[in-house]
Amino acid sequence: MFSRRNLLALGLAATVSAGPCDIYEAGDTPCVAAHSTTRALYSSFSGALYQLQRGSDDTTTTISPLTAGGIADASAQDTFCANTTCLITIIYDQSGNGNHLTQAPPGGFDGPDTDGYDNLASAIGAPVTLNGQKAYGVFMSPGTGYRNNEATGTATGDEAEGMYAVLDGTHYNDACCFDYGNAETSSTDTGAGHMEAIYLGNSTTWGYGAGDGPWIMVDMENNLFSGADEGYNSGDPSISYRFVTAAVKGGADKWAIRGANAASGSLSTYYSGARPDYSGYNPMSKEGAIILGIGGYNSNGAQGTFYEGVMTSGYPSDDTENSVQENIVAAKYVVGSLVSGPSFTSGEVVSLRVTTPGYTTRYIAHTDTTVNTQVVDDDSSTTLKEEASWTVVTGLANSQCFSFESVDTPGSYIRHYNFELLLNANDGTKQFHEDATFCPQAALNGEGTSLRSWSYPTRYFRHYENVLYAASNGGVQTFDSKTSFNNDVSFEIETAFAS
């Protein structure tokens, strides 16, 4: 129950100027960690929200709100990252506890980056506007993860805590585990009840809810719970919102899942009650590390997008969470533009010419299923001209972006598979559609366009030894070489050789 003082404070905190953590503070459940790349989560916060590292020279900078309590300075990011790539290296904790999130280390599973670390996220994969002002979220492909194994002030053992996250309800998969919250400090599986984290996805390996998913569930380690029982719980609905608020809280023999459209409306309670009646979950044995985008022992096959989230000390009341939801809705999250530079038009047929000096007579083509570059001109055979011509269609996974259908093999599209670009028939699956969707941006070398993978926005169409790859600007693969990267990922859009 709230005291008269706290009810007054909560009412004041619900004003437009207050941030989510001001509201939690007024409810006697203060934030112990607060993370966002889009905005300040306290009305007075004016420090760094996140750190960027750019690919051209590996230098770093920090991005702060435009004003105290305001929206991130996206223009500072755009200036710093112009004509190169940028990664998000640190997501800073706004609570003052120093619970910053950095590149997740190896654990029970290795990550795909050097020394088993997880990948870092692209800085431009999740553009949004908040109240009309541009910002960027954290688009996390499989293999991407952030962590802090030495967090301060987070719940341990059976201590009470709450948390929420604003996520993309359309970006998910069924792999383990797109989480945000409390996890093991060793990055290994230390047993049931050692985690308490928000999960969003459509995995049915452990728990699941009504419909086909995705669902908000709670990762308590060795199980995803959608309600009191293992497996199916009908009270946990499928999520269809583009922006979703996921709220979880847990204390001594109680926990809850709540959710809402982050753009409108109020929170609904999907479960509130006793802890699962299975060994290890009552009492809990939480360890207090913080994870984002991965499971507790660095299981890193999941995908999702994160915009903001916090963890609290104490079990927040429904009233407090409801006020936080009002604040999130008032932020007015809207999808931003994924494309820039020379435009494509769905239905047009194009040829794409290499701009790397010494290779400018070569065009993107294919030989059977291999996507490559070949020398093509007006005197080339009809067969080669058709192999070097592509029909532009609306992106199979995202309507802002595009997919490229072969002129000579209708129904087959350029897609990435193990980061090679292949020409494969569209099998109608979600996976294929995501693999075959690419977002054009102004060419990194200033000549034409660069084509960025929608599902792996650190990766671009790149020709390397005359073969096409989905390559990053530096990385563990030979085709990720930084040498000539900007030239190798830039292509001129030309009238097709064939139609």
Swiss-Prot record:
Record's signal peptide: 1-17
Gene3D superfamilies per the UniProt record, alphabetical: 2.60.120.200, 2.80.10.50
Gene Ontology CC terms: extracellular region
Binding, substrate: D219, N222, N223, G296, H416, N418, F419, D435, H463, E465, L468, D488
Residues of the site described as Cis-peptide bond: C176, C177
Region (Catalytic): 18-335
Cystine bridges: C21-C31, C81-C86, C176-C177, C401-C439
Predominant place of localization: secreted
Pathway stated in the Swiss-Prot or TrEMBL entry: Glycan metabolism; L-arabinan degradation
Catalytic activity, EC: 3.2.1.55
Domain of life: Eukaryota
Subcellular location as annotated: Secreted
Function noted in UniProt: Alpha-L-arabinofuranosidase involved in the degradation of arabinoxylan, a major component of plant hemicellulose. Able to hydrolyze 1,5-, 1,3- and 1,2-alpha-linkages not only in L-arabinofuranosyl oligosaccharides, but also in polysaccharides containing terminal non-reducing L-arabinofuranoses in side chains, like L-arabinan, arabinogalactan and arabinoxylan.
Similarity comment: Belongs to the glycosyl hydrolase 54 family.
Name this polypeptide is given: Probable alpha-L-arabinofuranosidase B
Gene source species: Aspergillus awamori
Gene behind the chain: abfB
